[in-house]
Amino acid sequence: MIYKPYNLKDVVKASEQNKFTVVSTFAGGGGSSTGYRLAGGKILCVNEFVKEAINTYKENYPDTPVLPDDIKTLSEKDFSKYGEIDIFDGSPPCSAFSVSGAMVQGKHSKGWGQTKN
């Protein structure tokens, strides 16, 4: 198997195929979005509320709407207004949600909304 490095032009070209639609939550700088785009997916919108991650995402994909709110405040209507959703992707940060960590009962306090230095 030959490894082919991709650049952003390759990603944009592949995503123009529009084989399926995606909403991505906990989007970070766009890693999952890049994979979906390379597979021919169209990203309808993403959710991310960490400012540094939003800035990175917008730098990578300036035409994709970013919902900059805490996901706990969003509803299905906030996402579905961008079109019919084939894949709803969510990849929350493990340290804030893992039950093996020392979470405060009923709260996702450990690392929630914090950036790593």
PLM regions with names:
Residues 1-117:
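Conserved active-site and SAM-binding loop architecture
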